[in-house]
Amino acid sequence: MEIEVPVSELRKNKVFVATPMYGGMASGMYCKASCDLATTATKYEIDLKFFYLFNESLVPRARNYCVDEFLRSDYTHLMFIDADICYSPEYVLTLSALCSEEKPIIGGPYPKKVIAWEKVRNAVDKGLGDDDPLDLDKFTGDFVFNPTTGTTQISLGEPVEVLEVGTGFMMIRREALDAWREAYPQFAYKPDHNRSEHFTGDRYIHAYFDTVIDNDSWLGEGNSNNSDRYLSEDYMFCQLARKIGLTTWLCPWMSLQHVGTYVFNGSLKDLGRLEYAAHGADMKHRPYVEERRKKIQNTTALKTKKKGKRK
């Protein structure tokens, strides 16, 4: 999707980028992206500030501290970016342009830290790795969002309304946070003293983000969907936001990466089942490609034949 917005309009928004950083650690890809974002904002004279919260092991509490820091500032838009997300700086400017009264909560899709092997298998069956096996990496993701009820397909070229979107890459308007706080006064709490200037244990802040069970016992009558789902802190925030008319949106064209660890498996015994095992530089030999295609064709023909018999 292409969005043309005058720089003068982007300058009207003051973006507060908040990153909870447990252990004070961030991925190199996040650091590079953030340097690029700072450079881009400076180039176009956009007021953008980074805030890092170190060594808070409880993620919901870290997010609530970040919100409180934002609300005590004069910035207009809160941008959550987690320390393990790789992104394009243009995406932040895009969210800033789109985040409005109509779209007060908006984010980008990033993959969960899991490989969806069934999708890789389906991509192989469709021949999407025939030209370049490295292309199969594009089909490994399960994404952090939930579509609205009844949605069967989405347009990749425009923002789409969703039930929930992850805070790993989410922008929120100040007015949305104000409305949320007024609607749910019961979530005010006194944070523990954490040896910092603004969190001394003698004032209230708000729990915009918390992990809850989605039922009336936890959230109060009328605030839950009684699904008994265990809601993560971002999904809880989105669900309660939607209850008071604050819509949540996703930009499906954005391509984000989620950095994590992976245990690399495999054995020579298992490779032996292939009879032919290519080495890393061999991207051309496909000894089983015709065998696979014939198998798929035969399976398709068999299914068609069975359908014909039923008639």
Model-derived segments and their meaning:
Residues 75-86:
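Short beta-strand-to-loop acidic/aromatic patch adjacent to the donor-nucleotide binding site
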